[in-house]
Every structure is written in structure tokens, then in C-alpha cells.
Amino acid sequence: YKRQIFTTGIDMKEKLEESLKKAIKNASRSPAPPKLAAAMDYAIFPGGARVRPQLSLAVSNACGLDNFDLSMASAVSVEMMHCASLVHDDLPAFDNAEVRRGKPTVHKAFDEPLAVLCGDSLIILAIQVLTAKGLSAPERLGKLINVLTTSTGMPYGICSGQGWESEKTIDLSSYHKLKTASLFVAATKMGAISAGEDPEPWAELGQRIGEAFQVADDLKDFSDSQKSGKSNNRDKENERPNAVLKLGEQGAIKRLQDI
């Protein structure tokens, strides 16, 4: 494979955005229904920090980035899964959030049926993008799909974490690992796999970043919604697990520092 190393973070972000736009454009071609296509575009752009896909690309970069297209597809698929989870998480059945990334959530901007279909379509698109670029490296593709689906399904992924919100009691650390850290772990492991390297040494990095990210998000849930860009105090209103609610603000800060 030809090596192609990112020289700057800006270069990485620009190529990532180009790839995301291309994926959404391909999914929006005729005979795609215009409203659903618009909802998918709305869910992806403008993006947030793109932490997960950039983390995946950074790991690929550190591993030599010997298959640029596959590493980029891996990063795009991680972001697609993440955005799909946000669309579903914001629905009235879950958080009933009205604002995400400083604008109305998908079900508010469109409607609930389109939001459900949008999330579902992004999940499928994540797999499509990955397989399209992975056929040239089948030995890596199988591992990538396994990591991505494991991190999003049952019993180790986002769906499992979301499901725990319906239980009466839950260990906060386990909840954070499943709902948030699992996709960060996927990002680091997929970054390594797509570059032909062993993913396991990178798993702990994803785990720690993911847990820290969720605790920080829990703290942000009690901040000003104009600053955070999303609906706040939803965890308290919906009785969701939250580090601040369980540990107090200072306890949550200490937990963040310990991670």
C-alpha cells in the first residue's frame, strides 16, 4: 500500500469533511426521497468537534497510514455511527432534546418519522462506506466491521448503554464505558486496523478518552445551553445516569481528573 501521512490537523479535518460530504452526496442521489436526504445532511453538517473520526485518523497516522482510503472510510463510518446515535438519542422516546450543535434537533427540524429513518440510514451508510473501501483489503475489513458493530450493538456497545437507562440501578462507570467510551475505543482500534497494525495497544487510549469525554459532558449538561450548543439538564429531567447527579460537581471533576 502507498503511505500518505497527514502533516497537519487542519489537513486531516479538511479531508475528513470532504469524505463525509461525498458519502452523504452519494446517499442522496435519485431515487432518494429529498426530505430524508436533507435530514441526513442536516444531521452531519455542520459537524461538532469530530473528535472520534479525527482520533481514528490520528491513530492511523501514527501507525503509518499505509491505506489512506480505508483509514478515511473507517473514520467516516465512526462519525456516521456517532451522528446516528445522536439523532436517535434526541428523540422524544429518549432525551426529547430540542437543540443539538446550536440548532434544532433532527426531529424538531423535520419530524419524528424522518428522524428515526435518518438515524437508521446513517447506520447503514456507515457500513456501506466501510465495505466499499475495504474490499481491496478483506483481511482488514472483517476486523473493522467486527469492531464497529461490537461497539454499537449488544452487549458491549452504544445500544447496550442506552438500554441501561431503562434499568433501576446501574454502575456509572459501566454505563459510561458502554454508551460513550465504546465508540472511542472503536475509533482507536479501527485506526490501527485500517493501517495494518495490532489494535489492542490502542484500546486503553480510547477507553480513557471516552470515559473522560462522558464525565465532561455530564458536567456540561448543567451548564448554559447557549454555551454547550445543546439542550441541558436533560439527564436530571429524564432521570438518566449522570456523574454530577451521582457524585456532585466536585466529585465529577475529581473523577475526570482520575481518568
Per-region residue spans from a language model:
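Conserved small/polar residues in nucleotide/adenosyl-binding loops
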Residues: Y1-Q4
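Mg2+-dependent prenyl diphosphate-binding active-site environment of isoprenoid biosynthetic enzymes
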Residues: P31-I259
